[in-house]
Amino acid sequence: MVDALNLGRRLRVRSTAYVAGEPVPFFWPMRTFIHHNPLYGLEDMPFEQAVRRGAELFHARMFLPRSDYQRWQREGKVRPETLKEEIGRRSQDLPPVPGVDWPRWLHALMQTPHDRDAVVRGVRAKDVHAALHGHPPSAQAVDVAALLPELEQRLHARTLPEAVDALWGTGLADELDELVIKNCLDFFDEDQSAWRMPGRERGLFSAWSEVTRRNARMVLRRLHVRHILDHVQDAESAVVYVMEEMGIGAEAWPTYFTRVLTRLHGWTGFVRWRASAKHYYWAQQYPADIVDLLAIRLVMGLALLQESARHRGTPMRRDDLGAVVRERGAECVLRYALHSGEVLPDWAQRIDDTLSRGNGARCHDLLQRYWPLWQARLGQQQAAALRELAAAANATAALDALAPEDVEGLLQGLRDFAPQEGMVWTLAMEGQAIDKLLTQVQAPQDPPPDKIPFAQAWFCIDVRAEPIRRHLERVGNYQTFGIAGFFGVPVGFLGYGKGSESHYCPAVITPKNLVLELPAALDPHNEDFVSTLGHVLHDLKKSVLSPYVTVEAVGMLFGLDLFGKTLAPLGYSRWRRRIDTEKPVTRLLVDKLSREQADSIIRTLQRAMIVKALHTELKIERERVDDDMIRELREIALRRRDGPTRLRTTFGVPQTQEAEFIDKLRQVYGVDADYTNHQLERLGRIGYSLDEQVNYVHTALTMIGLTQTFSRFVLVVGHGGKTENNPYESALDCGACGGASGIVNARVFAQMANKPAVRERLAAMGITIPEDTWFMPALHVTTTDAIELFDLDLLPPRHLVYLERLRDGLRAASRLTAAERMPKLLPEAKALEPAEALRLANRLAVDWAQVRPEWGLSGNVYGIVGRRALTENSDLQGSAFLLSYDWRCDPRGRLLENLLAAPVVVGQWINLEHFFSTVDNAHLGSGSKVYHNVSGRFGVMTGSLSDLRTGLPMQTVMREGRPYHEPMRLIALIEAPLDFAGRVLERVVKVKSLVLGGWIRAIVIDPTQGYKPFVFNNGQWEERTPLIAPAEKEYSA
């Protein structure tokens, strides 16, 4: 019987599943690594509340062990005043206990030299009181019924397979993980595996169902999955059927679904992202969504429960499980103790033997003997911990004087504080970091208007740019700016020889415009070039044929002389091939096509397709037909005129064959009116209009405050990492460019800014760029510290004389940056000269065995939005995102809105990914690179089978087993009047909620109040001491 759901029930299943999956953040493919906040789905909660919820959902630790914070405290990185204030504030919410000075006890607790929890799990106050006073354990009979509510609560919080595992040690949940992961690998594979799941184009659940019905592995495992599938029609009906079979009511579905989906949150996050990525080729071809994944896991889980019920007698419905717990309470308490590991070691075998006999009376008798001993052991452990704590707090007498009910109050207070301790340490570290920053930044001074720097350089806001900017400014007359590394231009990019479009912009943006990369010297027979245009014009879902183009089409499209004369059809698989030769010099097609150009291109393409069709279908060679005949066939195929054609009179083609040929031109070769419109739409995406280019350049210049005093060179510096044998290579690239290198955006922006028509319009808007100012794209290679210049062949001849001076300055800054960076990677490199350090950086970047060619963005803590003059005299040691902004150029606050809504939010994602990857690398990071296995070309697993690893690898945030990154929330500093910044924050709702919710620590430095800092703390702005003014700066020519 197949259960078909009505529309209402179907929508309810889907909406419930979608909402249940929202706590799981998106996970992007590894080749475009996107930094993300692992708790993004919980950002509607205050930070402290969200970390508690995140710990439950992801079974993860949210703060580091106490000993790590104590080490930083010894190093002076913890603000003692904040520690004292937070302990005092939180002590007020703890239950009053006679003789217990909570601030003193909590301070002593945070200084204890171990990482144990303050309260032993499951301990009772009366047992602790007895142990403190040397009394024997209670001889009172164990009330089994009193133990069951807590047991039922723990089981109810789990999925049904997990609950059965907890009582019977069956391993169903792990087996279910294995089955789901294997099926996900088969379906989502992106041409890495030799075998892929058939029928994938029908969607995940449909393809999986067909394969599973015939899967011999299911039979060997004695799983009757086919029987379940016979009762369902699709994913939605499968979800309903399984939930009903397990006896779980609809009111419990949201919580249950969330537990199911967070079990493998990496795979869930990937499926969620993939379903939302409409541009992603693999998602278009092989669709899947969260309901498919949920249904597969539920169906497989039910099959495992049924198999366990048949062979072990375990329950397969939630109400049956509850009945077992109530009817066989003593047995279930013992089972849970044994399989959870919460058991006295010398009793484990005895309990196992008793359970294996299945005798209820024996279980009851054993529990009566065992449980008092277990509780006494817990009481003794807790008493010893309290005595140690009381001694540290100088309160031993107060502890001894506590009555049993007071001991309960003490334990409850310690329980209440336990999840807060990490937050207190974090606040104290952030307090120290804020104090440190406010002593480093200085009241900015504008340079004299007649002093023009030799060169200006725009860098990404990435923290790795801070050291090289600092060194570049100090080796010569350079002025640097910080801007999001996509330079404000969202780029859809089709690279030379690539088969698919990539997005070079923040993950929250979808670019409308497409830029093509084309060889500067075209080879008419070059298939890479053909595939570039072919991909633009042809929708892969409609046809696997690539168009055929001629020299004239290319001339009209690109303003170049050569293109191709006769080109062969290419399928998608061929488009993906790479020619293993050195990449030629290329140009970017940045300008919009006119309608006339687009029409001409399509006409030429269609003519070429007709020539090919004549040869392929009718064996008529090109030299036997003239242009008039080709034009006639095109007009008829486009339904602009009626037949017959000259094919009949010239070549004797029968009428029926002629009609078939015309139909093939339309259906197979794309010579069709509808497809023509589609081609025009695709061509319409190429390039940017003049208005768009002017807007992008004007916005960027205004945002960073560069509206006058332009240098001869303005470097537009993207960044990227170059490493070998590194699945996480894209994590070293530019997050603002979608996890790709920033050089594409740098080249696009420079080309726009150098265009005379753009400059003419900018001058009319009040920004005059001198004729001899040249915007030059460059790439900061963060793994080698080099700055590589691009498009030098376009450099005006009058600039060549200055080029070597520019390169000398860049090389000097690179060497100094390497000398600063190498000792952080390798302590033994501390004594290296700058040139030696640079050579070492280059060697590490190409070393296949090197698991850490750089620290990436580890160490990030600050986001500074303001003029460079605030920080130009500060050594921020690569800890700050530096965003250039001049509030005086932004009277309405629109530019600040954009900075807060995009770069600051992305900075917060980066910051919190490092935070959580550090505090629990096993669950929220990705573990050691040593055990990583690339999976399906889109992710990595640990070993051969695991959840997708979503965070940062251990080698990025840890050194020798200890945290290298210091987990603190982003401290965002804004240079602007307080009321002005406050109004802007009110308008940017997302950032406002992040600040109010404690996800971002905010500071405003008000230039209208003598550069007085205001720190947002506990819901209000706190005044701090005004900044000092820097010493007078000298400017060289």
Curated annotation (Swiss-Prot):
Compartments (UniProt record): Cell inner membrane
GO cellular component: plasma membrane
GO molecular function ontology, one term from the record: zinc ion binding
InterPro entries in alphabetical order: DabA (IPR018752)
Topological relation to the membrane, as annotated: Peripheral membrane protein
Residues binding Zn(2+): C460, D462, H719, C734
Cofactors required: Zn(2+)
Keywords, in A-Z order: Cell inner membrane, Cell membrane, Membrane, Metal-binding, Transport, Zinc
Main location: membrane
Record Pfam families: DabA
Stated family: Belongs to the inorganic carbon transporter (TC 9.A.2) DabA family.
Quaternary state and interactors: Forms a complex with DabB.
UniProt xrefs under HAMAP family: DabA
Functional note: Part of an energy-coupled inorganic carbon pump.
Designated name of the protein: Probable inorganic carbon transporter subunit DabA 1
Organism, as annotated: Nitrobacter winogradskyi (strain ATCC 25391 / DSM 10237 / CIP 104748 / NCIMB 11846 / Nb-255)
